[in-house]
């Protein structure tokens, strides 16, 4: 929407801050709701507060407690700046409260990912790979991978893949992966992992 193009998180942050500031200056706004914990979310949150506007964070209070993860840094910054925290559950409320958020600014609204799945369930189509491989509904495992840190820790990832394949037994594993993740997984898979099926994102 803002026309930001980059794979570098710091460049994304800078571009979003610049373009979102321009957007807010051209459009009268009282409050901004930011969603999730991406670099663009953090950038929009910072700009919102610098403009003196009300900031609400949807999916607040989520923590991995691993400060080496870029998203964890984003979460801490966004929640720290927010005037209103919309959380997914009681455990998220507890995190927000432990970090000093006033009870009056924390609202448990549920998990928007689950809400989206329920609301769009009728639009889902049966993945083509099921028919191609003769796989019955409900008789498969889905595997996905998008964390750069996990892809970089190749030995850990390889052990994880081996453990998943062993635990799955004869149950097929369908892995909808983006190109980079697919390349990494392909390099690390055991040669006899014939039931591990990589496909394009669905």
Predicted regions and their residues:
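Phosphate- and divalent-cation-binding pockets in alpha/beta enzyme and binding domains
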Residues: 43, 95, 116, 183-185
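A nucleotide-sugar donor-handling region in carbohydrate enzymes
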Residues: 3-4, 81-155
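Short, acidic/turn-prone active-site loops that include or flank metal/cofactor-
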Residues: 60-64, 111, 200-202
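Active-site and donor-binding regions of nucleotide-sugar-utilizing enzymes
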Residues: 1-102
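Donor-nucleotide binding loops and adjacent catalytic segments primarily
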Residues: 125-202
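Conserved active-site and cofactor/substrate-binding residues in soluble primary-metabolism enzymes
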Residues: 11, 15, 73, 91, ...
